[in-house]
Design a protein with these regions (language model features):
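C-terminal domain-tail junction helix/linker
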Residues: 46, 143-145, 166-220
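RNase H-like two-metal-ion nuclease catalytic core shared by retroviral integrases
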Residues: 116-118, 126-140, 145-170, 185-189, ...
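An active-site-proximal beta-strand-loop segment
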Residues: 50-83
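Basic, flexible linker segments flanking DNA-binding modules
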Residues: 1-60, 120, 127, 131-137, ...
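Short small-residue beta-strand/loop micro-motif enriched in glycine and branched aliphatics
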Residues: 82-86, 148-150, 174
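Residue-level detector of anion-binding/catalytic polar loops
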Residues: 8, 110, 146
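Active-site beta-loop-alpha junctions of metal-dependent nucleic acid enzymes
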Residues: 68-69, 85-113
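Mobile genetic element proteins and their domesticated derivatives, centered on retroelements
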Residues: 14, 51, 75, 81, ...
Length: 220
């Protein structure tokens, strides 16, 4: 329109002039994201984060297992950081349900809430059967445990279990190889007991998760 009305200077020149005169439109800055304060747990079992890790294929050395996929199911109590892991050959709602059964037996206190992502091994939220509970959710209900799913595409909301998986890559998978599923399951169990639940942590006042649980049980 300016050209049609006889404007002959360059558009960049006009822009510089308007900016110099201070008459450019001012766009307000985008509001700064302020994360919500993290909800602290008051007792063990109040909320436990659960997630699944795919075992790196580079760790599988035996020709009989090369090309197969193993999975590490992980649960972390938010209060004590106590962790329970188990090896599985399949990644589905049945494996998730069996993991919950074993977790309930292993954890020394009642579990109030389980928090997961929106994977189909946990929920039908993003499937064609969204109104139908998964076998995993059925087992949770049988034990009186509520199921909380995090916001989609925000793994930081399950941050404790996500960080533990990154540590697993550094401490375990980077240095270990597995020649069968049974070998993987055995090594994973030993690693978790030795290098995690008995390992002192700064957020726990340099106590181990096992010690925090022990102290809590002694106080009730």
């Amino acid at each position: 329109k300016l050209k049609q009305r006889g404007y002959s200077r360059s558009i960049p020149g006009l822009y510089r002039f308007l900016r110099k005169q201070g008459i450019m439109a001012v766009h307000p800055p985008n509001p700064k994201y302020i994360p919500k304060p993290y909800e602290q747990m008051d007792y063990p079992g109040q909320r436990i984060q659960v997630d699944v890790k795919f075992v790196p294929s580079a760790c599988l050395k035996n020709p009989k297992v090369i090309g197969k996929q193993f999975f590490q199911y992980t649960a972390i109590d938010e209060y004590s950081r106590w962790r329970f892991v188990e090896a599985f050959e399949e990644h589905n709602t049945y494996s998730s349900a069996m993991f919950i059964e074993h977790l309930v037996k292993a954890f020394p206190l009642p579990i109030q809430c389980i928090q997961t992502d929106n994977g189909a091994e946990f929920t039908n939220r993003f499937t064609t059967h969204r109104d139908k509970p998964t076998l995993f959710q059925v087992h949770l209900k049988q034990h009186g445990i509520c199921h909380k799913v995090i916001r989609p595409f925000t793994p930081r909301h399950n941050g404790k279990v996500e960080r533990s998986h990154r540590k697993d890559n550094e401490r375990f998978y980077a240095t270990h190889t597995f020649y069968s599923f049974e070998d993987f399951a055995k090594q994973l169990k030993v690693y978790n007991r030795r290098d995690y639940n008995n390992f002192p942590m700064r957020p726990l006042g340099w106590k181990s998760p096992n010690q925090v649980l022990k102290d809590y049980l002694a106080s009730v």
